[in-house]
């Protein structure tokens, strides 16, 4: 998916006065905006405003809507005549069509029913902050607000995982044991040792001390009342 985002980003450098080229570039721009909406953490990392408190919609409905969008995009791609595009956009069309076909092929395997991976997943959500700009008090407030919405993502993950089990989609036990250990780290009651609190231990000196205290207080409250209970639910699900 990151390859798709990168492709869309660099594609906007192409331009043409020919109608077909303009239509194609307009299509790519719409796809780019859609991708940003689907990947709000990435959007924030790219400096795009308006997604600062959001997580990807990992609900079953959200997943199905994405699959439908990719299918619709593939249909739209087929409408473009390569011979009416300049050489740059001919290449862009081939590449984006190939990426879309690959996404469609992958969706046939229902990989979303395996929502856990020891190298990524909701149990490692704290790692998202590594790609985000954290320079001002506002940046930290946005991150706290995003954390307050993490419970919904965890609940949706459990719901999708439960559906996967009902359909007999099971990941290797050895991998899930690693995931379980990662979850237990998040559900520990010691806030100071919680992975989500690490980023608040040393705040930029440009943030006034009183504001630093307020940010840490809000972070501890959020971790205690929102993060730890949500991961405890996830831990119980794994049991």
Where are each of the predicted segments found?
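Sec-dependent signal peptide recognition
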Residues: 1-6
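Hydrophobic h-region of N-terminal signal peptides that target proteins for export
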Residues: 7-16
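N-terminal maturation segment of proteins
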Residues: 15-239
């Amino acid at each position: 998916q990151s390859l798709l985002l990168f492709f869309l980003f660099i594609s906007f450098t192409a331009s043409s006065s020919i109608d077909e080229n303009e239509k194609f570039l307009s299509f790519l721009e719409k796809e780019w905006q859609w991708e940003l909406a689907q990947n709000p953490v990435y959007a924030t990392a790219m400096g795009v405003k308006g997604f600062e408190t959001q997580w990807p919609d990992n609900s079953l409905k959200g997943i199905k809507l994405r699959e439908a969008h990719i299918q619709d995009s593939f249909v739209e791609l087929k409408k473009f005549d390569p011979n009416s595009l300049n050489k740059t956009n001919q290449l862009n069309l081939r590449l984006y069509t190939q990426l879309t076909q690959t996404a469609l092929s992958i969706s046939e395997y229902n990989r979303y029913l395996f929502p856990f991976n020891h190298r990524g997943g909701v149990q490692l959500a704290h790692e998202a902050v590594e790609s985000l700009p954290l320079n001002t008090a506002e940046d930290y407030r946005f991150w706290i607000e995003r954390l307050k919405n993490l419970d919904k993502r965890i609940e949706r993950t459990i719901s999708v995982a439960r559906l996967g089990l009902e359909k007999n989609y099971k990941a290797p036990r050895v991998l899930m044991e690693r995931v379980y250990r990662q979850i237990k780290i998040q559900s520990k009651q010691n806030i100071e040792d919680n992975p989500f609190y690490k980023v608040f231990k040393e705040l930029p000196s440009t943030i006034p001390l009183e504001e630093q205290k307020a940010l840490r207080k809000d972070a501890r409250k959020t971790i205690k009342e929102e993060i730890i209970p949500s991961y405890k639910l996830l831990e119980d699900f794994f049991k």
